[in-house]
């Protein structure tokens, strides 16, 4: 092992500069400052911060970050000590503790290697894949446990389908009401023409009144269309603007999420590599030279986690607002639809109740003369019977003699 050599191995900083400093942290009620430590004797020449936990003194102060090297505690050097010994040194101090460190001036772009990019692609593929399928394909991955946002995304998709169905149904309903209103208008026009041409005043007035009722129903239908049409606009706004905007935010969130999970997977792989070398008793070059590559990935993971947490917070807030708008909007739209249709049917009922003109008495003989002036004159049944009796009792003129003499009674004689 490198620790058994008589000379020191120079640290391989990968061109990453460090800046020394110190920070005083006030411990919490559990006598902790909120950091985890890695490295140290006997395999690594330096100790460094692996993770800064949320809502702890170190996280709230924001001075130290993952990957920073710890050089001393309260003015005491920790060179050559193990991480367990350094943790005890920090725990022994009550109240405030001063941490001396070398700040790692890392560029996150330097940690975005081809390996991280490929891991992002793999996580994107595995996202919609079951665990059994991923395990069968041998795809290692990092997942978020108890991710409640997944259920929210499923609810968003169901809400989008609901609004899509309501939009289509409302369109069909408006189209049907428009055709119905045009039918009522046609009825009104027909009965109006009949009323104008009806010679009897009572029947004419009844037909005109019935025609006006249908025209009023047509106006009620147009008013219903004008009232419900904004509902369709609001539904389309929610469906085509609000939901796509949320999906775009979710798409950005997923990109940040996959990047964070990729760094988590990379850290896990590097930890496994280090543990394997320790188990075999073989020194690992990057560990023996300061483990700067690992510390760079730790810093990138911390920054990716910060972006992920912020983006997740934004997505949850946007989805919460979207849910509130959905609950309020759907109630308002349905109330508008129900109240408008109720008013439409009540108005139609009132108009038709006042237009109860049936039965209508119509003089068909007079009406026939009025409508058929160019036709043959109408004769009733009694006149037809008299003509039939005459034809049966008296011969026709054609059957009589052309110049037959008259008998004593003045009738024609057969020739």
UniProtKB/Swiss-Prot annotation:
Q: Where located?
A: Cytoplasm, Perinuclear region; Membrane; Postsynaptic density; Synapse, Synaptosome
Compositional bias, Acidic residues, is annotated for: 377-391
Annotated AH domain ranges read 144-357
Q: What kind of membrane protein is this, topologically?
A: Peripheral membrane protein; Lipid-anchor
Result for mutant: residue 27 to E = Abolishes interaction with GRIA2, but not with PRKCA
**Keywords, in A-Z order:** Actin-binding, Calcium, Cytoplasm, Cytoskeleton, Lipoprotein, Membrane, Metal-binding, Palmitate, Phosphoprotein, Synapse, Synaptosome, Zinc
Q: Where is the PDZ domain?
A: 22-105
Q: Which CDD domains match?
A: BAR_PICK1, PDZ_PICK1-like
Q: Name one GO molecular function term.
A: metal ion binding
Q: How is it modified after translation?
A: Phosphorylation at Thr-82 appears to inhibit the interaction with AMPA receptors. Palmitoylation on Cys-413 is essential for long-term synaptic depression (LTD).
Q: Does the keyword Phosphoprotein apply?
A: yes
Q: In which tissues is it expressed?
A: Ubiquitous.
Q: Which InterPro entries match?
A: AH/BAR_dom_sf (IPR027267), AH_dom (IPR010504), Arfaptin_fam (IPR030798), PDZ (IPR001478), PDZ_sf (IPR036034), PICK1_BAR (IPR037959)
Phosphothreonine is found on 82
Its domain description in UniProt is:
The AH domain mediates binding to F-actin.
* Function, as annotated: Probable adapter protein that bind to and organize the subcellular localization of a variety of membrane proteins containing some PDZ recognition sequence. Involved in the clustering of various receptors, possibly by acting at the receptor internalization level. Plays a role in synaptic plasticity by regulating the trafficking and internalization of AMPA receptors. May be regulated upon PRKCA activation. May regulate ASIC1/ASIC3 channel.
Subunit structure, briefly? Monomer and homodimer. Interacts with CXADR. Interacts presynaptically with the glutamate receptors GRIA2, GRIA3, GRIK3, isoform 3 of GRIA4, isoform A of GRM4, GRM7 and GRM8; with NAPA and NAPB; and with BTG2. The interaction with NAPA and NAPB disrupts the interaction with GRIA2, conducting to the internalization of GRIA2.
Designated name of the protein: PRKCA-binding protein
């Amino acid at each position: 092992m490198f620790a058994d050599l008589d000379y020191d191995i120079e640290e391989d900083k990968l061109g990453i500069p460090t800046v020394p400093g110190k920070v005083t942290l006030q411990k919490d009620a559990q006598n902790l400052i909120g950091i985890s430590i890695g490295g140290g004797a006997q395999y690594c020449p330096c100790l460094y911060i692996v993770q800064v936990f949320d809502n702890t003194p170190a996280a709230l102060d924001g001075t130290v970050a993952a990957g920073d090297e710890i050089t001393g505690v309260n003015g005491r050097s920790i060179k050559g000590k193990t991480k367990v010994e350094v943790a005890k040194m920090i725990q022994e101090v009550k109240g405030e503790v001063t941490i001396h460190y070398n700040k790692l001036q890392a560029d996150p772009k330097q940690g975005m290697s081809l390996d991280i990019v490929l891991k992002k692609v793999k996580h994107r593929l595995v996202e919609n894949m079951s665990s059994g399928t991923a395990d069968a394909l041998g795809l290692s991955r990092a997942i978020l446990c108890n991710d409640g946002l997944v259920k929210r995304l499923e609810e968003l998709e169901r809400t989008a389908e609901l609004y899509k169905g309501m939009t289509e149904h409302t369109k069909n309903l408006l189209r049907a009401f428009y055709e119905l209103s045009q039918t009522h208008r046609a009825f009104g026009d027909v009965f109006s023409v009949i009323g104008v041409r009806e010679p009897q005043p009572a029947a004419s007035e009844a037909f005109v009144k019935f025609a006006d009722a249908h025209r009023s129903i047509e106006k009620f239908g147009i008013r219903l269309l004008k009232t419900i049409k904004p509902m369709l606009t609001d539904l389309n706004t929610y469906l085509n603007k609000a939901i796509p905007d949320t999906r775009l935010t979710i798409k950005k969130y997923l990109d940040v999420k996959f990047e964070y999970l990729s760094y988590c997977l990379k850290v896990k792989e590097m930890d496994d590599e280090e543990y394997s070398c320790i188990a075999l008793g073989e020194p690992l070059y990057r560990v023996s030279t300061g483990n700067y590559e690992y510390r760079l990935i730790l810093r990138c993971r911390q920054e990716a986690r910060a972006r992920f947490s912020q983006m997740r917070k934004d997505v949850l807030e946007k989805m919460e607002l979207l849910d509130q708008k959905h609950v309020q909007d759907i109630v308002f739209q349905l109330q508008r639809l129900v109240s408008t249709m109720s008013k439409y049917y009540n108005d139609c009922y009132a108009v038709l109740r006042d237009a109860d003109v049936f039965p209508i008495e119509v003089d068909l003989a007079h009406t026939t003369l009025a409508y058929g002036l160019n036709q043959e004159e109408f004769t009733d049944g009694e006149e037809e019977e008299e003509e039939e009796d005459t034809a049966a009792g008296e011969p026709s003129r054609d059957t009589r003699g052309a110049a037959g003499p008259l008998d004593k009674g003045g009738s024609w004689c057969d020739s």
